[in-house]
A protein has these predicted regions:
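C-terminal and inter-domain tail/linker signature
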Residues: 20-24, 32, 40-46, 54-57, ...
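Arg/Lys-rich amphipathic alpha helix in sigma70-family domain 2
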Residues: 78-98
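Conserved alpha-helix in the HATPase_c
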Residues: 50
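N-terminal cationic leader/targeting segments used for protein routing and processing
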Residues: 4-8, 94, 156
Length: 330
């Protein structure tokens, strides 16, 4: 294959994209339940969303190598997610004995929780078995299939895990709020793309999660920031909704959304409020990483209804779903 031929590479990309959407048409109805399972395993909405997406990618790739479709799609997806998560936990190197003087809210929440609960209290298999049984009412046979093991091993894992699984309550310290976040809010709410791009490092990564990723201020100026600021003009006009499901965007007004900072479990988040004829609601959340007075990473969660719904519920904010997918024009 000549990967320098644009016609060849564009045709391949189109075929893969079309196959991916056909795959999602079939398996996406299982996504909310798969997210709940991954949420139990990872104990982080962000990590759960990543695990779900990785599991779907893995399933999509494997499907092309299988002689026949999985007989139990639900158990098959749970099995892929379980194996991915177990492999990741087992790959973590043992942490040194914790030093209280070095404990910091800067440590990733997922690492602290994995070290404190997943590794010291339960083995990965024990935790997965307990979650599948108690939260999803899987039978022993279904758990064995999902974890690629025997029913006898499942019984042992459940017996051990139930005795050890105690969910501790974590007191998370709020991370300091970088001044650049206030500057970002002010620039965004003023609709000032120049000021927004000036806050980015030259190597900054700007991502609309599960849609596209851009690098650097100029790419953000032309792409991601334009969509975040002015995409509502398209959402409010059904005739220009190519790529989006109109069912999700009823009552949207063509106004630039506003952002505000909210603290969620120790992390400062940018919450995007969209105007609707029946009241404002949150449709997106942005996470950022900063280095001094510049942003190194911007991740906009727009097509992630499970994550957005959970966080908005905890923050007691009204929420509207955008669905899971972005469809490009044919």
């Amino acid at each position: 294959m000549d990967n320098r031929n644009p016609k060849v590479t564009d045709a391949l990309r189109h075929d893969v994209e079309a196959s991916w959407h056909r795959f999602l048409d079939l398996y996406e109805p299982l996504r909310p339940e798969l997210y709940r399972y991954c949420r139990h395993l990872t104990r982080s909405p962000w990590d759960a969303d990543d695990l779900v997406q990785d599991a779907l990618f893995r399933a999509f790739a494997r499907l092309g190598c299988m002689n026949e479709m999985p007989g139990n799609p639900r158990a098959w997806l749970f099995r892929i997610a379980s194996n991915l998560w177990i492999d990741r936990v087992r790959a973590q190197k043992p942490e040194p004995e914790p030093d209280p003087q070095r404990a910091s809210s800067r440590e990733p929440r997922a690492v602290r929780e994995a070290a404190g609960t997943l590794l010291s209290r339960l083995s990965p298999q024990e935790r997965a078995a307990v979650v599948l049984k108690e939260a999803f009412n899987f039978t022993l046979e279904e758990i064995a299939e999902a974890l690629s093991t025997t029913q006898g091993t499942v019984k042992s894992a459940l017996h051990r895990g139930r005795g050890k699984l105690i969910e501790p309550v974590y007191q998370v310290e709020a991370s300091p709020k970088p001044a650049v976040l206030d500057a970002f809010c002010a620039a965004f709410n003023a609709g000032d793309v120049d000021r927004l791009t000036s806050l980015l490092l030259d190597t900054a990564e700007i991502e609309v999660v599960r849609v596209h990723t851009e690098y650097g201020p100029e790419a953000a100026r032309r792409g991601g920031f334009q969509g975040m600021l002015f995409g509502t003009r398209r959402l409010a006009d059904p005739a220009r909704l190519a790529g989006l499901d109109p069912a999700f965007f009823r009552n949207v007004l063509p106004q630039v959304p506003r952002v505000e900072l909210r603290l969620h479990r120790g992390e400062w988040l940018l919450v995007h409020w969209y105007a609707h004829s029946d009241g404002d609601a949150v449709r997106a959340i942005t996470r950022v990483e900063a280095d001094g007075d510049r942003l190194t990473r911007v991740r906009n969660y727009f097509y992630t209804p499970d994550v957005l719904g959970e966080i908005c519920a905890e923050l007691q904010l009204p929420f509207r779903s955008n669905g899971y997918r972005y469809w490009k024009e044919a």
